[in-house]
Amino acid sequence: MRLHELRPKTNYKKSRKRKGRGMSSGLGKTAGRGHKGQNARTGGGVRPGFEGGQMPLQERLPKRGFTNAFKKEYAIVNVETLNDFEEGTEITPEVLLESKVIKGVKDGIKVLGKGEIDKKITVKAHKFSKQAKEKIEEAGGKVEVI
């Protein structure tokens, strides 16, 4: 028998630690909490990030930047994904949702130019990148901003 051939016993279940059940259990008396102090008491302990009164790390570090409340987040669709649709179809946000290309519309849909397209399709979206616009129009398709 070698180390890598060792297997645990079948149907073996390690018994849980029963704290505070007598000295001979090994976890009696203080039950692993030490002697006195805040952590020995019920409900004791300090909140996360508390460093004993010292200025906590998250307060020592400088603040940075801000969150723009007016930021628009677009659902992104690449040109290569549009290639999966049949030629001549009109691709709208509803069609993209139904076909599960996007999970949600968010603040609109933006078509980006990754990949190639060789089908003549009409795409209706809120924004297009220059490359995406060029590729769709090169393939004979139409681009409509909604």
Swiss-Prot record:
The entry's keywords: Ribonucleoprotein, Ribosomal protein, RNA-binding, rRNA-binding
Gene3D superfamilies: 3.100.10.10
Pfam short name (any one): Ribosomal_L27A
Skewed-composition ranges (Basic residues): 10-21
InterPro entries in the cross-refs: Ribosomal_uL15 (IPR030878), Ribosomal_uL15/eL18 (IPR021131), Ribosomal_uL15/eL18_sf (IPR036227), Ribosomal_uL15_bac-type (IPR005749), Ribosomal_uL15_CS (IPR001196)
A single cellular component GO annotation: cytosolic large ribosomal subunit
PROSITE patterns hit by this protein: RIBOSOMAL_L15 (PS00475)
Annotated GO biological process: translation
Compositionally biased spans, kind Gly residues: 42-52
NCBIfam families (alphabetical): rplO_bact
Similarity comment: Belongs to the universal ribosomal protein uL15 family.
Purpose: Binds to the 23S rRNA.
UniProt protein name: Large ribosomal subunit protein uL15
Organism: Natranaerobius thermophilus (strain ATCC BAA-1301 / DSM 18059 / JW/NM-WN-LF)
